[in-house]
Amino acid sequence: MSMTDPIADMLTRIRNAGMAKHQKVDIPSSNLKVSLANLLRNEGFIKNYKVIADNKQGVLRVYLKYIDEKDHVINEIKRVSKPGGRVYVDSDGIPKVKNGLGVAVLSTSKGIITDKSAREFGIGGELICTVW
């Protein structure tokens, strides 16, 4: 079965694993997903990640982070730009997620970056998702 939106699949797997209180979740790997996992780790939304090689595309193992034993750090993770309706923003149109408490993730000419970095660089891009 072909997957039409692998990024939405990744975000859904992370959301579902967090609600089920899992410590880790395995996701089919790609360069874009690894960049997104790296950004989530740098922003403190996940503990860590690692890429496990197999004979196919590899597996991205994401280790989830919890405030205590039951509360997941990620309250909401939502896909914004979808294959059926891409959402592009310029540097002035980048949204603030929960008045700066959350993070908007953009795909730009400088790679996968946060809304704060995009404002500093003065560039826009495709609004991939929001996390808070």
Swiss-Prot record:
Family annotation (InterPro entries): Ribosomal_uS8, Ribosomal_uS8_CS, Ribosomal_uS8_sf
Biological-process GO terms, alphabetical: translation
Alphabetized SUPFAM superfamilies for the sequence: Ribosomal protein S8
GO molecular function per UniProt: rRNA binding; structural constituent of ribosome
Lineage top rank: taxon: Bacteria
Entry keyword set: Ribonucleoprotein, Ribosomal protein, RNA-binding, rRNA-binding
Keyword rRNA-binding carried by entry: yes
Family, as annotated: Belongs to the universal ribosomal protein uS8 family.
Designated name of the protein: Small ribosomal subunit protein uS8
Gene3D superfamilies: 3.30.1370.30, 3.30.1490.10
Pfam families for the chain: Ribosomal_S8 (PF00410)
Keyword Ribosomal protein: yes
Annotated gene: rpsH
Transmembrane segments: none
GO cellular component: ribonucleoprotein complex; ribosome
